[in-house]
């Protein structure tokens, strides 16, 4: 019998400001790996996290 997929999945969060400003001198995009519960949050996850390239707290969105 096949095993069911887990409810929690691994997702990647990416900085929204670094992605829009591709020509930064720091040269990078901040990414965080986290887990989310598919049942509780079916839509894409958005969290305020610290970006070391922007040197401030900014919105990070889930990417596929």
Curated annotation (Swiss-Prot):
Localization annotation: Plastid, Cyanelle
Source species of the chain: Cyanophora paradoxa
Protein name in UniProt: Large ribosomal subunit protein bL33c
Gene Ontology molecular-function annotations: structural constituent of ribosome
GO terms for biological process, alphabetical: translation
Gene name as annotated: rpl33
Protein family according to the UniProt entry: Belongs to the bacterial ribosomal protein bL33 family.
Alphabetically ordered keywords of this record: Cyanelle, Plastid, Ribonucleoprotein, Ribosomal protein
Major site of localization recorded for this protein: plastid
Gene Ontology cellular component list: cyanelle; ribonucleoprotein complex; ribosome
């Amino acid at each position: 019998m096949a095993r069911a997929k887990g409810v929690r999945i691994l997702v990647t969060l990416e900085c929204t400001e670094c992605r829009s400003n591709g020509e930064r001198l720091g040269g990078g995009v901040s990414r965080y790996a986290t887990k989310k519960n598919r049942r509780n949050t079916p839509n894409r996850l958005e969290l305020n996290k610290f970006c070391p390239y922007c040197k401030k707290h900014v919105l990070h969105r889930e990417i596929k």
